[in-house]
A protein has these predicted regions:
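Non-catalytic structural scaffold of enzyme domains
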Residues: 2-280
Length: 280
């Protein structure tokens, strides 16, 4: 899997994105929209999904294996499109030197919040992400003046994966977790799970008018765009980027979910064996 050549002023090597499952495909979609000239390699470790119920040590091991697999493609940058990895594994991994810049959705989300200048923030996430305190700690470390509420929304992911993103059922689930936001509205709501952007239209209708909704997928794309420019790693202008999707287990509902997350059928889906990851 040789790297594509770097020209004098541009770098056409691919970007690597990875997640434990398919939620990270919302990040791929955002990156493809923001950076259409960039090639993207996505790894979905669907054979071991979810990472959220694993120990931090196991999550870090899996993340290192995922990165080692992507590194075979000669990637020029990588983003952990997985909140569990960003919370539990990335802090240790980032302490080491890498041949390419590496980031995650939590850092990107925090930067997006800070850029708004608003102080009252609500973070929505899975039970594991919220329990880790990763977003809250990162936000308060960046600006201690922020007022942060973290809300676990464990039913969001299974409902989204069933294809239900609006209607009475969704409203009932919002009432279950988010009624407090109607009584005491935040200025910013950060969607701290890569599945949650599919709820964004419904959330816009549910939350008080004027509430700014930020999603980690769009934030990751913005972060990556700035990173490539700062490091001089942008692809040649005018080229059409390509996407390749690697999965360790093509489940029966994979194509259906992939279409929902990507809003398009672009790119090639390639099945790989879990051994290809473990032995990377």
């Amino acid at each position: 899997m040789p790297a594509k050549r770097r020209t004098k002023n541009y770098d056409n090597r691919p970007i690597g994105l990875f997640d434990s499952g398919l939620g990270g495909l919302t990040v791929v979609r955002a990156v493809r929209e923001a950076l259409p000239g960039e090639d993207v390699i996505y790894l979905g470790d669907t054979a071991r999904v979810p990472y959220g119920n694993r120990s931090p040590e196991t999550v870090e091991l899996f993340a290192r294996q995922d990165l080692a697999f992507l590194e075979k493609f000669g990637i020029k940058a990588a983003v952990a499109a997985c909140n569990t990895v960003s919370a539990l594994a990335l802090p240790n991994i980032l302490r080491e030197k890498h041949s390419f810049p590496l980031g995650g959705v939590i850092l990107a989300g925090v930067e997006a919040v800070l850029a708004t200048g608003r102080r009252k923030v609500a973070v929505l996430g899975t039970r594991g992400t919220i329990a880790s305190g990763a977003y809250e700690h990162a936000l308060l470390a960046a600006d201690p003046r922020l007022i942060v509420r973290s809300i676990a929304c464990p039913l969001f992911v299974p409902v989204i994966e069933e294809g239900v993103t609006n209607g009475a059922i969704v409203r009932e689930i919002f009432d279950l977790y988010l009624a407090q936001l109607l009584r005491d509205p935040p200025e910013v709501v950060l969607l701290g799970c890569t599945h949650y952007p599919l709820f964004r239209p419904a959330l816009s209708q549910y939350l008080p008018k004027g509430t700014l909704i930020l999603d980690s997928a769009a934030a990751a794309a913005d972060y990556l765009s700035r990173l490539l420019k700062e490091k001089g790693l942008c692809a040649e202008p005018g080229r059409n980027g390509r996407a390749q999707y690697y999965v360790t287990d093509r489940t029966p509902g994979f194509e259906r979910l992939a279409r929902r997350f990507l809003d398009a059928g672009d790119g090639e889906v390639i099945d790989i064996h879990l051994a290809d990851i473990v032995n990377s």
